[in-house]
């Protein structure tokens, strides 16, 4: 995990330095630019990493998930044994296993690293899926943990936050100075209105990028679930999800790591964290056909 963080931060430091050079060539004050880059990186990455570190605590609190410490029923015993077996196969530490009240068929994984994760399933999943289907869902969530998706998404969000902050202020300064005729860059009330509007616009594009990456990550988690539980079980689980008409009650901070996402067409699809279930099923079937 630390190698991934180091390489990611190193790459983005180089990008930020390049951005600083470009802005200097455009006439932006280098001293102001350096301070802006530092401030943006602190706020951009700071929020993402605080959310990552608190993710397990917040997920438990927001969903009311109850961690299974000592299994009291055959179902709880099966959950622990299945997660333990899959975690060993994936080469990660044993996650905490929890159950939360929810009518929808869903599950999620969260945590700061591969060896300190939480996997939770809804009561709706336990009531509406058989063990083969539930095993595939657990495999999907274990694959999220093994792939380091929580850390990667936090890093990506940090970079996007940083660029939104920087670009909004740089472009806002240029627009404000052009409109006011002050080449030194005005900092009046209009500047802050412009920056606020630009942050909203750039934030939408940043969300599209993050959700695009999230959708690609779901295909990988499906493939990982198929490897851990079996391709036919993973396909059956997704087909079962396609029949689920329950409302997604997962809190926003863990929805991206659930097995089931929203439904949308057109522009709304650009803001969905999960691909359509039909595409996920087709991808698994195509992979099965190419493997023969």
UniProtKB/Swiss-Prot annotation:
The protein's UniProt keywords, in alphabetical order, are: Cell inner membrane, Cell membrane, Hydrolase, Membrane, Metal-binding, Metalloprotease, Protease, Transmembrane, Transmembrane helix, Zinc
Instruction: Report the cofactors.
Output: Zn(2+)
Broad enzyme group:
hydrolase
Tell me which domain of life the UniProt entry assigns to the organism this sequence originates from.
Bacteria
Which GO biological process annotations does it have? proteolysis
Q: Does the keyword Metal-binding apply?
A: yes
Name the principal localization, coarsely classed: membrane
UniProt family annotation: Belongs to the peptidase M48B family.
Q: Which HAMAP family would you find in this protein's record?
A: Pept_M48_protease_HtpX (MF_00188)
Q: What is this protein called?
A: Protease HtpX
Q: Which organism is it from?
A: Xanthomonas axonopodis pv. citri (strain 306)
């Amino acid at each position: 995990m630390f190698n991934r963080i180091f390489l990611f931060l190193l790459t983005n430091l180089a990008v930020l330095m390049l951005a600083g050079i470009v802005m200097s060539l455009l006439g932006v004050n280098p001293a102001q630019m350096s301070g802006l880059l530092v401030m943006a990186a602190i706020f951009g990455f700071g929020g993402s990493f605080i959310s990552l570190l608190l993710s397990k605590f917040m997920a438990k609190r927001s969903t009311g998930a109850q961690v299974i410490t000592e299994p009291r029923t055959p179902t709880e015993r099966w959950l622990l044994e299945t997660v333990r077996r899959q975690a060993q196969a994936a080469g990660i530490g044993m996650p905490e296993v929890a159950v939360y009240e929810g009518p929808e068929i869903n599950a999620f994984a969260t945590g700061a690293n591969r060896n300190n994760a939480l996997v939770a399933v809804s009561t709706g999943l336990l009531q509406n899926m058989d063990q083969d289907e539930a095993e595939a869902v657990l495999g999907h969530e274990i694959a999220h943990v093994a792939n380091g998706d929580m850390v990667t998404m936090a890093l990506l969000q940090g970079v996007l936050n940083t660029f939104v902050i920087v670009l909004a202020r740089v472009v806002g300064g240029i627009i404000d100075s052009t409109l006011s005729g002050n080449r030194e860059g005005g900092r009046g009330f209009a500047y802050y209105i412009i920056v606020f509007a630009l942050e909203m616009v750039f934030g939408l594009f940043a969300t599209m990028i993050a959700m695009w990456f999230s959708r690609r990550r779901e295909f990988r988690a499906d493939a990982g679930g198929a490897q851990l539980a079996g391709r036919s079980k993973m396909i059956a689980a997704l087909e079962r999800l396609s029949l689920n008409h329950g409302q997604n009650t997962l809190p926003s901070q863990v929805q991206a790591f659930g097995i089931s996402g929203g439904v949308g067409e057109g522009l709304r699809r650009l803001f969905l964290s999960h691909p359509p279930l039909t595409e996920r099923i087709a991808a698994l079937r195509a992979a099965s056909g190419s493997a023969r």
